[in-house]
């Protein structure tokens, strides 16, 4: 036994160190479990990496240049700063249904043709074995919905170009190159490259479903900020198909950009063609008015000052007219809060102020000069506008016929030769880490949740004396265990029939050696007791009380003492199976008055002691144990035997042990390593003491040699046997 100094304050540093060592020991104790789980997860990751379908990535590069506008906007560069190309709207345009819809129509992406493989692993296995996949070329396919749902058809390849098409409500045979129609389904197969018996699953999705599926694998990003370089990427399991899709998207985007530019030029050209006749008519009218006025005034000419003012006014009017045309174009592209539009409005305001200033100078001139100046201004301004519009018309005609847009394809689509998924090395590493994390976490969680007693100190902290620690007998455990332990349970079930008797069949076992040490401790503990009767009980079922009491009876009998073993567990006692003796006449028959002592006492020859088995299970075991015949039996046995060992039921299950314990001199409580908690043992001892039972202490049974226990408490139980040599 060990003692504990209650006045010593706990050292938190030492306790933390012990807890850490205990956790390390737990990991070492369960190293096989950790290795197995980690290996399992690693193998799963390897299998996933090998069997999963490789995903490839294709990319193309498109440049969006700064919008130059049409000829009407060609003069804006002098009043607004250069701006970077706006990539965000172009990215949205590339991902729009307008662009993707054209690609889906061009490549027939609504049609889905998939070869049928064994579920989950079939495709990966075919790829690993380098089995060439089948190919099915479809010229035309139409699959209507059935009951509002998309339907799938199964095509089975036959011999010599024949095939069988199966739907939910039909089965029909077809031939390559011939149109097949059945229940609204129309199909024309152009070519089949597959072995007979190969199956394909055919389905057809809506255009919107195809667009949504394409958007999930298609991404657009700007390579660097405000660079105008757009990188288009697409992922998929068919390298050739994703290359064709990307090229189609890029070309469709380019064509719509050119068409849009041409449409803008065409719209501007139409605007100019409407304006030219009106401007020409206004010019003719202005010239006629000027000529008429001069004839009336005898060819009045302008002085130098008036000519200078006229030139300035005409210049301002020309600029204002040019801004009018520019605004007509800009209003189609930008809102008024756009920097380009704001710059135009500011320029117009400046010119308007300049024109007002010039008009004030004109108003100070003689009336004749004012009128001539006004008419001349109208003629010069009209002539400038007309010539400008003619030039613009020619420029727009050329621009419309040679429109190239502001987009160009820099790099055509290319698929990278190596798949981007799965990342095999990363998957294996993650599988290893995940398996290690889960296994270690499970072991540590189990260690933190486990509350069973694993060392005598845990009982002694509650004031309970520990008379012996009996190690687990691996020899006996292998022969009697009914089920294997699991990680989160210490409870083990053992056979109660056809079991060996350890003290006789393997007397050199370490558990038997521990019981011999218990025999020595009991010799001194029972010297001052009122009788030589020893009761052994347990806290809960499966604590091992019968094993301890029967083995103790055998080792004491081996020291030439006369021993009587009484099985007082009238409910579940199984000593008759352990000793291979009859159970027809036992303790229950004696207590009920059916048999006398000479009929219920049997001699167990192999063990060298006498036995009273439990007998037949009575309906009232507690009441039988409370009868005087039980007390009389114990008194008689005390007089005729050197030691009487009474095996009683678990204390927390029934009260039988408290009934029997009042008549015995010494009592011991068996606690199972890892199964019983210190609270259960303490509560059992308390109930026995309240019943007036002289309880000496406890026995820690089934101790397993663990690294965690050794690190925490420094125990190394009974490693010596007769076969060991020094």
From Swiss-Prot:
The chain crosses the membrane at residues 33-53, 425-445. This is Tyrosine-protein kinase etk. It is a multi-pass membrane protein. GO terms for cellular component: membrane; plasma membrane. It is found in: Cell inner membrane. Its EC number is 2.7.10.-. NCBIfam families: eps_fam, PRK09841.1. GO terms for molecular function: ATP binding; identical protein binding; protein tyrosine kinase activity. Autophosphorylated. Dephosphorylated by etp. Keywords: ATP-binding, Cell inner membrane, Cell membrane, Kinase, Membrane, Nucleotide-binding, Phosphoprotein, Transferase, Transmembrane, Transmembrane helix, Tyrosine-protein kinase. InterPro entries: AAA_dom, Bact_polysacc_biosynth/exp, GNVR, LPS_length_determ_N_term, P-loop_NTPase, Wzc-like_C. PANTHER family: TYROSINE-PROTEIN KINASE, TYROSINE-PROTEIN KINASE ETK-RELATED. The gene is etk. It comes from the Bacteria. Residues 54-424 are periplasmic. It catalyses: L-tyrosyl-[protein] + ATP = O-phospho-L-tyrosyl-[protein] + ADP + H(+). Residues 1-32, 446-726 are cytoplasmic. Belongs to the etk/wzc family.
